Amino acid sequence: MSNQSLTPPFGPQDVEVLERETPFQGFFRVDTLTLRHKHYNGGWGEPVRRELFVRPPAAAVLPYDPVRGEILLVEQFRVGALEWRDTPWCLELIAGIADKDGESAADLIRREAVEEAGLTLGTMEPIAAYMPSPGGTNERLQVFVGHADLAGAGGIFGCPDEALIACCRFRRNLPW
């Protein structure tokens, strides 16, 4: 690999939004954009239409008990997995979307940990911030590892029968 910068050469000024419509507004929103953008040869491309699934920022946490050497995952039904997996119940990190103005990602995750798993998180460390699928959504996701006492973890939390807690033990401690 060459010694090139990983910073893209283009920015927002290199995109021209010609039209933006909102054909769907529900719990989430879908926008249809007609836009054009610069090409690597320096010229502007022809207008294209793109659908954008508009989502608030999201955050997730991997609860980790360094004393017990365990992590916690939440099992929940997910409609998005209905057609792509053997089962639409997924083992996941505790996660949520920002639904309160001004709530930080860390505060969001502390709230979700209580709501989804009855957990109080201690020290939290950020481990990633990324856009999971920027070709079709503007969602931004921040991921943390959070120390927690998982000794009494387990059961069903959140809405009735919404989340089942699963703890997994490791043979050695993780670096967090």
What spans do the regions from the language model cover?
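N-terminal presequences and immediately downstream first alpha-helices
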Residues: M1-L35
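A short coil-to-beta-strand element that immediately follows conserved catalytic motifs
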Residues: E16, T120-I127
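Acidic pyrophosphate-coordinating catalytic loop
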Residues: E21-G26, G42, L82-E83, Y130-Q142
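Acidic, metal-coordinating catalytic segment for phosphate/diphosphate chemistry
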Residues: P23-R68, L82
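Conserved hydrophobic/aromatic beta-strand scaffold that supports enzyme active sites
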Residues: V30-T32, L73, V143-V145
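Active-site-adjacent beta-strand/loop module that shapes the phosphate/pyrophosphate-binding cleft
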Residues: L35-Y40, S133-G154
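Conserved Nudix-box catalytic region and its N-terminal flanking loop in Nudix hydrolases
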Residues: R50-F53, V67-R111, A153-E162
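NUDIX/MutT-family hydrolases
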Residues: F157-W176
